[in-house]
Each structure stands twice: as structure tokens, then as C-alpha cells.
UniProtKB/Swiss-Prot annotation:
This is Glycerol kinase. Keywords: ATP-binding, Glycerol metabolism, Kinase, Nucleotide-binding, Transferase. Inhibited by fructose 1,6-bisphosphate (FBP). It comes from Psychromonas ingrahamii (strain DSM 17664 / CCUG 51855 / 37). Sn-glycerol 3-phosphate binds at residues 14, 84-85, 137, 247.
Amino acid sequence: MTDKKYIVALDQGTTSSRAVILDHDANIVSVSQREFKQIYPQAGWVEHDPMELYATQSAVLTEILAKESIRSDQIAAIGITNQRETTIVWNRETGIPVYNAIVWQCRRTASICDALKEQPGLEDYIRENTGLVLDPYFSGTKIKWILDNVEGAREDAEAGKLMFGTVDTWLVWKMTQRHVHVTDYTNASRTMLFNINTLKWDEKLLKILGIPLSMMAEVKSSSEVYGQTNIGGVGGTRIPIAGIAGDQQAALYGHMCVEKGQAKNTYGTGCFLLMNTGKEKVTSSNGLLTTLACGPKGEASYALEGAVFMGGASIQWLRDEMKLLADAKDSEYFATKVDSSNGVYVVPAFTGLGAPYWDPYARGTIVGLTRGVNSNHIIRATLESIAYQTRDVLDAMQADSGIKLSALRVDGGAVANNFLMQFQSDVLDTTVQRPAVSEVTALGAAYLAGLAVGYWESLEELAGKAVIEQTFEPHADPVKRKQRYRGWKRAVKCTQAWAEMHDEDFE
């Protein structure tokens, strides 16, 4: 055990940058957060300014240490967790990005993916070697788009002048004064360029997409010292950066789901269900991803993942675009003012459908509207859609793995909504466990960093600190459960291939 007092987790998310300080008992001492701008150049396109990502992340770190009067020599290590797949390409010499960060939600490369699907055997090769599906969601086609569309980028890349990184790589490179170009297995596994069998960059895929190997970062485990940073505050001590994991894998680790068959769902902007499958690579036949997660010591292990693109973002849509809510937190109050959704289903496929459908051309739909439907029914149906989408993924996961979950661990902003959690339990017919500490993603990053530097000796030491705040048990009528879910499946069919079939109608 070290005599340092604190661990810091940096959580660079889709809408905000956060810093979380933990003490040796894994208690949260303080949290600091700054939001940043979402950029929408065209319909279906989503970008961030990479310099703003770094500026907000470094600002919250400096801010939180100053606020708590904590010196850098009191920090044992920093762990980083980040929005995954989001793609940044920058100049190795100047450090300036050649284009905005293309965000995981961005669908601009759908046509590139369609063209690649014409290559015989390529989809199967990608599935077998990266564990992913050929979809705009992942980094590979985003890098290709930048190299193909930014003037001079392809030439500079071929000359070895450009670097690629997911957000973790960009932050570490900046925080170490441009000395360390590194990523971890969990983030690498989300690029569609990393071979999860050999644990190396896949040179065949790099060649197909026209991406030079020189752009790619060194790939390491999720729990080791990658470099040092002097950003943070007074004390004069450089702080080790000792943990990196993509946000969903960090949450899985924060829940201590490190053994085969343990699973969690994170309800954030999107919803992400992960099940650890240990050393066994399970290839999905139900539209799920095979990805890399963290074993007990931060080493690479395998997991199944299902991604729902619109989770909490659908509630933001009710608030910001539909003006049905003043505050997202009010959704529970209005949803419980009615006894049911009155036959209404909302399918929030605003940017396509993720697992298990993988339809980039699906678009959002409200079905079952009658004269008796009011705003409360639509709010309730939107909340219910989050639970139904989770059921879609969990059914596929259990079919692939052969494991029936006894309980689902949950985290993320929406888990504070008791209506949603109870409905989730009812829809799944499974126990839902909500932990006392909501910052599970930050916990995972902190645990990985702390274990790397000896701040904590083992996961067993941490296990006693985990507390379940509330357990939700299913109590829905089995016949009604089946009927409701059948209605959901019919509603999903109404959304599929909409943009592909109807785009010309809007020209």
C-alpha cells in the first residue's frame, strides 16, 4: 500500500468532461464537470472539437485539485476512461488536429460501409478477427473518411506525419507533453482495425481502408503506468497515468464484473450492455459484438456487447426538441401520472438502430397514436423504449453465451429513475441491482490505476466496499409482458430501412 492519499479518475464522455477524486476506501471525495459543444454539420453527422475535449478535461482536473486543496504529490495515479470509437487524427509535428473529432454516433460513413460490404468475405473477416460488424459506429471508416476528405491528409499520412487516436490516446498524448502515443486493449478493440485473436493491429484491414500502420498507437493492458503528467496543480510531482479503459469496459470493471457470465448495463447517452466471457471468445450469431474487456488485473479478456444508440438521449429529445419536459428528471413524475403508455410505442432510432438490428437507415417512429394519447403517454413510452431495447440485447446475449443472468448490474444517469428500473426488471423478468455509488465508470478507471501503482493490493480488497443501494424484482404479469414485447417488435419493424427507402422523398 502506498502512502499517497488519493486516486483521480478522468471521465471524458460524449457530452462532458469530468474529474472524480477517490480516497483509499473508494469513497468519492469530489467531482468536477464541464460540458462542451456538440457540432452537427449535417443531418446524421456528429463532431467534437478535440482541443475543447482536452481543454475541458485538463480544466476539471486543475479545478478539482484546487477546490479540495490537494497537491499533485498526494495523488497516487490518474485513471482515464473515455467515450469510445470517437476518432481524432492530428499532425505529429504541430499537434494540431486535421479535422474535428468524428463522434461514435456519427453516421456519415454509411456509404463507405456499404461499398466495403461489396468485397467478398470482408464482413466475415471483420466479424471473425475484430469481433465487430461493418458499421459507421467504429473508428476505421471514420479515419478513412478524414484521409479521403481533408485536403492533404492522405499525403501527410503516407509520409508518417499524422497520428490517430481514440479519445484516451489523444488525452494521454497531450497530458504527457506529446511523449506517449498509447491506447489500451479495450479502446483498440473498438476501432474495427484491431485483431482480437492476435492482440495486434490487423494489417490486412489497415491496407483495405488505406490507413498507414505508422498512424496507430502502441496497445497496452488497461492497468499499468503509461507515462507521467505535470498537469493538475501545486506539489511539483509528476502524476503517473496508470489506467485506461473505454467507458463501458471501465463500468464493467467498476461493477467488478471480471468473471465469466457477469453483466452490466450503463444507461447514458446510449445504453451499453456488456457480459464478461472471460478467456473464451464468444462469436455472436445474434447481432452482438465480441469485444475486449478487463480481467481481474486489467489484462485483456473477452466480452459480449450490445449497443443501443439512444438511451438517455431520447429523454433529452423530449426536453430539448419536443419541449414535453423542462428537466429530464421530471420524466418519472409524468410517466407515473398514467397507468400505461396507452398502446403507444416510441422507437428512438434517430441515428439508426444498434444491436441486434444494425440498421443505419432506421429512423425514429411513434406508433399506436389515438385521440386519447397525451404527452404523459409519450413520455412513458419513451422511457419504456429504453427498457425494451435493453431486452432486445439481453435476449441475444443469453442466446449466444448460453448463460441466463441471475441479476443485472446497472449504472448511469437514468438509473435514478425508479419507474424505469422497475419496468426494466419487469420487461427482463430479471433482478436489477442499482449500486450505492453511481460513478461506476469513474470507479473502474480509478480501480485500474490504483491497482497498477499498489494503491490497492487487489480487487478482493475493493470488493467489500461495493454496496447495492436498491434491488428491483420483476412483478409483471407474464402474459402482459409477452404481449407488450410483441408490440415493441412490431414497432421496430416500422422504423427499419426508412431513410434508405424514403430519402428521395425529402429532396
